[in-house]
């Protein structure tokens, strides 16, 4: 017999403990219907409203007073009509009401009133717990749901600890947690969306402080101190389909400029022209790729005047121009406050009523800030603030910066114990309601003002604090991660950042970075940190946005940790730059579908329960599996490989059978990495920065499938910095390699799309990891010449006429070189 336990969402703010109410058994007496909405009326005047957003998404609203009213429209949901649902028929029976869709059976039991949702095969997916499904006391609301013995949960955005949430509890309250530990909660963002292996997701759309408990107590619950109990039940055949429906509700992620996918350098006191130039020259002198140099908070004269600090920057415009010539973009921080020391701007904002108010006296709230003295907190929920902030924000853009790092938006120094800030009154409500969306409202203003004043240019904004829906405006990073008592103890935080970032990706933060090196701790012994630094960089190379950052005046450039660390760091960074065509294609997929580039194994292998506990590795796209080394002194790594055949990507030769754990070598010089048999990986030459050469050859690494199967990849390309990707101004090139009994058929289809022209002419080089020597190769039925391997790649960048092939018997690689004409090409590779 299966024993059922409970999971709960808890929204707790005013009352620290729950007091049981004795009269919570509810009876449903009738229903009314209007369009997509069916409202069930209860004997105690409460109401349960179901709204069909689609055949698989149901909005559920429990209202104890039956009013079904919200103070504010949703900050996260932008579309509740995901598809036509036709006429909704409610089937009334003696004990229940039932609604059927093509995918779901929804049952509302009359007495005691409870909600159950089944799939079309009558499998129970989601159920209230008996007569305690919906409990309320005053403004506080609690939901109890049945938990199966084999049920697991994933999501809730950026959270520390293991990815499988079962047996844990989590709070939603954006908190500034400097040097947070590997078990810290809550953190900076609130994404109240999770998924169950029972093929459903839940998005709780309540911005107050909430708490989720997944089987932590004998009777578990989810609870809200205020606001409405509104949540969305999202059914899908797998996690990908659930995420797709969540995207439909909350919006697509924006796509970053291509340069944002390169490497970035920062540190806490990187706040001067001199230091910026030194770092830029250091990277270029050593040939280590880098695209971005950040300026931390001290770049401004005052918070937040957007003026370059006098004495630190002799000529900011010339500095930015010179760095641009070297291939660097500059991103600067901004905080959401105006320092009182910034007298002119503070008085202007105070006079205009642009600050959050103190509800006890009606004056601008006086906020102590970590630096810069006391500040006024800008009220981004007030519409008039947007243009005012945008005018100031535009000044450094006009000087030549390329983006913003929106920091401290919790707002800073906020944590769940600090109730004194609840007196803050925003235009759209009191702080207990607005706190979790404060950063989101700021991010929205930054993005929309950037696009308004810089037409057809992609925004780059990386934020720390946000709420569900942030993907429409910004990218993320995981905040000020701690390293324990000593920076050399940072191995635990390095390991922790893997599940933190994977979970962030499931919450529609597909483009993010951690602070590579871990944020906290003074570095006193650079040689002693060399190994840890190397492993941080190796992991960081697979962050979608890769930023090296550390607190204070602790330099963390690769050349400071010794020759071996520099060499290994450079190799890891170069690997990312080689993979940019692959990464950029997946950036487009993230825009289209919401799926993260860096993804947990269960996203691709949902039926393999072994993947539920693989927190120390991840997929990078579908084809690559990465297993960072996160233990001091380790030179091996225990890796789980899911179904299929996997090949060591570092040597391109060692083959592993999937659905098992295996221990692999992990020298300090490389990161364990695998490619699935039947994959095609597009690569490019390593450059100092992403746009160093507008025209370059593309290399496709082909790992053929088994006989009778195919390897395939569709390459995505666009301009890289404008908004053409939203106007379908891009091209795609489908490539298929079919494995035959006597060879391979490699098909390059004509480019698909319009509005963008690929720079050219250029070459395409195919490296086929075959292990079988070809007899001949034909292109469109015509034999092409064979040459030596070392000759095949001569002058690849300039000679776009040569068609040839080679065979390297030492490596088992067959290489074919053809010009890229954008037309159909068919290559036949016949074995001896």
Q: Where on the chain are the PLM-derived regions?
A:
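N-terminal accessory segment at the very beginning of proteins
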Residues: 20-259, 266-268, 272-275, 280-281, ...
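Bacterial Sec-dependent N-terminal signal peptides
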Residues: 1-25
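Catalytic-domain carbohydrate-binding cleft regions of carbohydrate-active enzymes
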Residues: 122-670, 675-676
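Aromatic sugar-binding surface patches on proteins
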Residues: 810-814
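Positively charged interface segments
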Residues: 655, 663-665, 791-796, 802
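Generic signature of intrinsically disordered, low-complexity, basic-rich segments
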Residues: 17, 54, 509-510
């Amino acid at each position: 017999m299966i024993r059922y336990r409970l999971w709960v969402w808890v929204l707790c703010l005013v009352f620290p403990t729950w007091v049981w109410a004795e009269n919570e058994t509810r009876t449903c007496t009738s229903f009314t219907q209007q369009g997509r909405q069916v409202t069930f009326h209860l004997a105690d005047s409460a109401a349960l409203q179901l709204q069909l957003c689609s055949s698989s998404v149901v909005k559920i609203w429990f209202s104890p007073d039956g009013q079904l009213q919200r103070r504010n429209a949703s900050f996260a949901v932008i579309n509740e009509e995901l598809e036509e649902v036709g006429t909704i028929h409610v089937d009334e029976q003696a004990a229940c009401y039932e609604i059927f869709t093509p995918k779901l059976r929804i049952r509302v039991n009359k007495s005691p009133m409870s909600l159950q949702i089944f799939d079309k095969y009558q499998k129970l997916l989601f159920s209230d717990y008996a007569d305690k499904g919906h409990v309320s006391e005053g403004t506080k609301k609690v939901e109890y749901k049945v938990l199966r013995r084999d049920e697991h949960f994933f999501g809730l955005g950026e959270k520390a600890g293991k990815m499988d949430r079962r047996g844990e509890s989590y709070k939603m309250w954006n908190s500034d947690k400097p040097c947070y530990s590997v078990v810290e909660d809550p953190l900076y963002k609130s994404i109240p969306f999770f998924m169950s292996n029972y093929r459903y997701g839940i998005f709780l759309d309540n911005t107050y402080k909430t708490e989720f408990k997944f089987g932590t107590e004998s009777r578990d619950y989810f609870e809200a101190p205020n606001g409405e109990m509104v949540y969305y039940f999202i059914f899908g055949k797998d996690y990908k389909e659930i995420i797709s429906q969540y995207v439909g509700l909350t919006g697509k992620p924006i796509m970053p400029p291509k340069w944002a996918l390169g490497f970035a350098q920062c540190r806490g006191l990187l706040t001067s022209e001199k230091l910026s130039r030194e770092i830029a020259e250091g990277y270029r002198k050593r040939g280590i790729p880098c695209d971005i140099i950040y300026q931390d908070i001290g770049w401004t004269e005052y918070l937040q005047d957007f003026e370059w600090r006098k004495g630190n920057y002799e000529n900011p415009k010339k500095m930015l121009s010179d760095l641009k010539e070297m291939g660097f973009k500059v991103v600067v921080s901004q905080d959401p406050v105006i320092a009182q020391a910034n007298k002119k701007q503070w008085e202007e904002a105070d006079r205009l009523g642009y600050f959050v108010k103190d509800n006890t006296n009606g004056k601008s709230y006086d906020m102590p800030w970590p630096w810069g003295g006391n500040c006024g907190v800008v009220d981004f929920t007030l519409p008039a603030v947007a243009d005012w902030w945008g005018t100031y924000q535009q000044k450094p853009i006009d000087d030549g910066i390329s983006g913003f790092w929106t920091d401290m938006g919790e707002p800073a120094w906020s944590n769940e114990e600090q109730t004194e800030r609840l007196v803050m009154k925003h235009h759209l409500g009191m702080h207990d309601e607005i706190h979790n969306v404060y950063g989101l409202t700021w991010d929205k203003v930054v993005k929309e003002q950037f696009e308004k004043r810089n037409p057809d240019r992609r925004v780059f904004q990386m934020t720390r604090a946000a709420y569900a829906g942030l993907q429409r405006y910004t990218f993320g990073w995981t905040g000020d991660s701690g390293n324990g008592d000593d920076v050399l103890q940072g191995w635990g935080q390095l390991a922790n950042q893997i599940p933190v970032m994977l979970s962030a990706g499931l919450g529609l933060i597909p483009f993010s970075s951690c602070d590579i090196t871990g944020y906290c701790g003074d570095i006193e012994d650079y040689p002693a940190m060399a190994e840890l630094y190397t492993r941080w960089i190796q992991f960081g190379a697979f962050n979608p946005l890769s930023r090296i950052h550390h607190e204070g005046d602790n330099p963390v450039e690769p050349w400071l940790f010794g020759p071996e660390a520099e060499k290994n760091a450079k190799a890891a960074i170069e690997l990312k730059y080689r993979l940019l065509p692959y990464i950029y294609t997946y950036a487009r997929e993230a825009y289209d579908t919401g799926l993260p580039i860096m993804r947990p194994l269960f996203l691709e292998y949902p039926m393999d329960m072994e993947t539920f506990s693989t927190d120390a590795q991840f997929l990078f796209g579908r084809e690559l599996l990465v297993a960072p080394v996160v233990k001091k002194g380790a030179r091996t790594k225990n890796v789980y490989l899911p179904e299929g055949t996997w090949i060591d990507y570092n040597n391109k030769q060692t083959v592993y059978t999937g659905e098992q754990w295996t221990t692999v070598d992990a020298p300090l010089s490389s990161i364990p990495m695998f490619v699935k048999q039947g994959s095609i990986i597009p690569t490019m030459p390593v450059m100092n920065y992403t746009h160093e050469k507008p025209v370059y050859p593309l290399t496709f690494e082909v790992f053929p499938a088994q006989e009778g199967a195919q390897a395939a990849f569709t390459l995505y390309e666009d301009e890289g910095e404008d908004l053409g990707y939203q106007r379908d101004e891009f091209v795609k090139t489908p490539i298929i390699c079919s494995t035959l009994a006597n060879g391979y058929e490699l098909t390059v289809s004509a480019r698909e799309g319009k509005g963008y022209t690929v720079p050219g002419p250029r070459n395409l080089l195919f490296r086929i990891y075959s292990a079988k020597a070809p007899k001949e190769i034909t292109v469109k039925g015509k034999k092409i010449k064979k040459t030596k391997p070392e000759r095949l790649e001569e002058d690849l960048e300039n000679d776009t006429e040569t068609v040839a092939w080679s065979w390297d018997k030492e490596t088992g690689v067959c290489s074919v070189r053809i010009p890229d004409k954008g037309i159909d090409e068919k290559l036949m590779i016949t074995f001896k």
